[in-house]
Amino acid sequence: MSLLTEVETPTRNGWECKCSDSSDPLVIAASIIGILHLILWILDRLFFRCVYRRLKYGLKRGPSTEGVPESMREEYRQEQQSAVDVDDGHFVNIELE
């Protein structure tokens, strides 16, 4: 028994598709969906950092400060910056002899 399928058979001119119902709407729809899926997958792999960062953080850079006094905004900025700053006192230098 041959390992070849009924659809693909070798001929003298190379591989040839012998699909009798290639104009079937289901086959056409499946082909279109397959091509679209491939295109979307390629775009996802190319731009995944941009896409997922936008989904994670949204369009805004942070919480809305609308209606908040300027003094509270500055206090919030300082808190955020101090949370980001690295405190060198937490690190221990180990010297090997």
Swiss-Prot record:
Residues 60-83 are annotated as: Disordered. GO terms for molecular function: monoatomic ion channel activity; proton transmembrane transporter activity. The M2 protein from most influenza A strains is inhibited by amantadine and rimantadine, resulting in viral uncoating incapacity. Emergence of amantadine-resistant variants is usually rapid. One of its GO terms (cellular component) is virion membrane. Homotetramer; composed of two disulfide-linked dimers held together by non-covalent interactions. May interact with matrix protein 1. The modification Phosphoserine is found at S64, S82. It is a single-pass type III membrane protein. Cytoplasmic tail plays an important role in virion assembly and morphogenesis. Keywords: Disulfide bond, Host cell membrane, Host membrane, Host-virus interaction, Hydrogen ion transport, Inhibition of host autophagy by virus, Ion channel, Ion transport, Lipoprotein, Membrane, Palmitate, Phosphoprotein, Signal-anchor, Transmembrane, Transmembrane helix, Transport, Viral ion channel, Virion. Its main location: virion. It comes from the Viruses. It is found in: Virion membrane; Host apical cell membrane. Belongs to the influenza viruses matrix protein M2 family. A lipid is attached at C50 (S-palmitoyl cysteine). GO terms for biological process: protein complex oligomerization; symbiont genome entry into host cell via pore formation in plasma membrane; symbiont-mediated suppression of host autophagy. Residues 1-22 are virion surface. The record marks W41 as: Seems to be involved in pH gating. Residues 44-97 are intravirion. This is Matrix protein 2. Forms a proton-selective ion channel that is necessary for the efficient release of the viral genome during virus entry. After attaching to the cell surface, the virion enters the cell by endocytosis. Acidification of the endosome triggers M2 ion channel activity. The gene is M. When the channel is activated, one or more imidazole moieties of His-37 probably become bi-protonated. It comes from Influenza A virus (strain A/Turkey/Ireland/1378/1983 H5N8). The record marks H37 as: Essential for channel activity, possibly by being protonated during channel activation, and by forming the channel gate and the selective filter. The chain crosses the membrane at residues 23-43.
